[in-house]
Amino acid sequence: MRSSVLRSLRGRLVINLESTRKLRLSRTNIVPGRKKGQKSIKSKNMARKGNPILVRLGKNRSSDSSWFSAEALLGCLYFFIYFVAPTLGPVLFLLRLIHFVWGLRLGLGNENFHFGVGPDGGATGLDLNQPPQEQQPTLGVNRAALDLNELPPVHLLYAEVEGPQSTKAQNDVMLAHLNQVQNLTRDLQTEPNIWRRQALIDILDWEVRSLQRHFRIFRQRDRLREVQRSWLREQLNRYR
């Protein structure tokens, strides 16, 4: 009786040991009867074909296509045409408007100047686009070889005092520009809006350049008038 119980317990123990051994072998993926470093056929197929689950999910591609495929490029082109391109119109228009305003600011005469008076009484500064200069009359050595008809007649010379090119008319034009500059300067000091201040600065810049140009031209005309009058006095004194 005792021997039969021992044999039954021994059989159960052998079965338990065998099941435990198989469980350990299944966990370590080692098939009985194979060497320790040798891989199974299943693992070889998985390494060659890839994990079936990952292959179905598309995450185990050995030669994955580039992101810049035809479909991706077409998608980017579609997004650019229908979403990005419509927003570029106002941006380009704004850039062209800024370029136009900036060119208008720097293109009115293309001048770099400083307002002042030189030693000869003329306005100083650098002007790239100068107005046409009136040339002085060409006089001989004795100033007597020239014909009197080459200069304006006496009545026209002295009638010019009350004409549109007279000193009074020139002073009125200069005074109008000077008053405009003073008014713009006063408005600029009290203007809080930055955009209107910039517009006032542009207008003031143009007014100062116009004032300088008129000042230079009028000074040249005054010098020419003085040369004509001095030559006429010499001619009149010669026949007294």
Swiss-Prot record:
InterPro entries: Mt_uS3-like. One of its GO terms (cellular component) is mitochondrial membrane. It is a single-pass membrane protein. Keywords: Membrane, Mitochondrion, Transmembrane, Transmembrane helix. Its main location: mitochondrion. Coiled coil: none annotated. The chain crosses the membrane at residues 73-93. It is found in: Mitochondrion membrane. Belongs to the universal ribosomal protein uS3 family. This is Uncharacterized ribosomal S3-like protein AtMg00690, mitochondrial.
